[in-house]
């Protein structure tokens, strides 16, 4: 009996000691891979799938050598997609034509996830939530793009089109787009970055009508936007 009591006491002491130890701090060493305008990857639109994969592998290898442990991968630069399981169109920056996917077919986000995880790195999906177009040249925007399907959801500012997040249906739509990725891909995080509301220009931002319709208790439009 005394041996059993001693064993239980020792086990309790060890367990308490383990739980009392604080978990070691983990340094987050993340790096962005921008796909918009082919800034980081792919180097240009229209590359074959094999060349796209080779380029991405080289980028990931470099970040692994530099001791990065997280990749923040831009998956939605302009209300379009760098992943297959999307109701939005393929990004212009893949093939040089919005709505046209990689040839031969593969899923860039799925490939990026697999390759990052092989290297012990997290893969975070980076969304540009409100920017819908990058260029004033409308010929680059597919007629099937959301800006043409739902024009009432957008305002034009500084030669670009933006979702109007003051509209409840816009917020619901963006939430749906992001949750689809969360549910269908083994990502390790979600990032909102770059182009929420546009940077201030000389012209007034044309969302005052939306503010009047949906003030949500705010009297100052700047506070309303921040909220």
Indicate residue ranges for each PLM-predicted region.
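Active-site-adjacent "subsite" loops/lids of carbohydrate-active enzymes
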Residues: 26, 34, 38-54, 114, ...
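Aromatic- and acidic-residue-enriched segments that line the glycan-binding/catalytic groove
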Residues: 81-96, 131-158, 194-221
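Aromatic-lined carbohydrate-binding/catalytic grooves of carbohydrate-active enzymes
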Residues: 66-103
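Catalytic domains of carbohydrate-active enzymes, especially glycoside hydrolases
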Residues: 54-80, 184-187
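Second-shell loop/turn segments in exported
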Residues: 42-49, 59, 98-102, 160-165, ...
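Surface-exposed amphipathic alpha-helices with a cationic face
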Residues: 64, 110-124
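Bacterial Sec-dependent N-terminal signal peptides
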Residues: 1-22
